[in-house]
């Protein structure tokens, strides 16, 4: 599994902490913003486009509140994204919605919660079946 990371100035510290966490967990990490992007849009687009190149990749963007990056990624055709601040939603975003990318607000989510969100997001597996109908609907929208 490969995880693509990005952040703006507000998310750079949490992104760095989560990058270390992922590397310790033996996850392949690609950091699209080694130095923080000045704007969440730039960081989000870099991560989303990289994720869409490889069906096995997932993306995580850190900004101040998660909302801006979410709105940006949701505009990209083929990208299913969730703005997250709890573990259960992270798991369900993968299992029922086949989310390939999440956004996390560094001013809302602390280090330990971010680790748990990422763990649930990465361990969730898309269930398919009846959920595929809504995934197809989402993919037709953008």
UniProtKB/Swiss-Prot annotation:
Q: What is its EC number?
A: 5.3.1.26
Which top EC class applies here? isomerase
Entry keyword set: Isomerase, Lactose metabolism
Q: GO BP, one example? A: lactose catabolic process via tagatose-6-phosphate
- Disulfide linkage: none
What reaction does this enzyme carry out catalytically? aldehydo-D-galactose 6-phosphate = keto-D-tagatose 6-phosphate
Pfam families assigned: LacAB_rpiB (PF02502)
Q: Which pathway does the UniProt entry assign to this protein?
A: Carbohydrate metabolism; D-galactose 6-phosphate degradation; D-tagatose 6-phosphate from D-galactose 6-phosphate: step 1/1
Q: Name one GO molecular function term.
A: galactose-6-phosphate isomerase activity
Which family does the similarity line name? Answer: Belongs to the LacAB/RpiB family.
Q: How does it assemble?
A: Heteromultimeric protein consisting of LacA and LacB.
Q: What name appears for this protein in its UniProt entry?
A: Galactose-6-phosphate isomerase subunit LacA
UniProt gene name: lacA
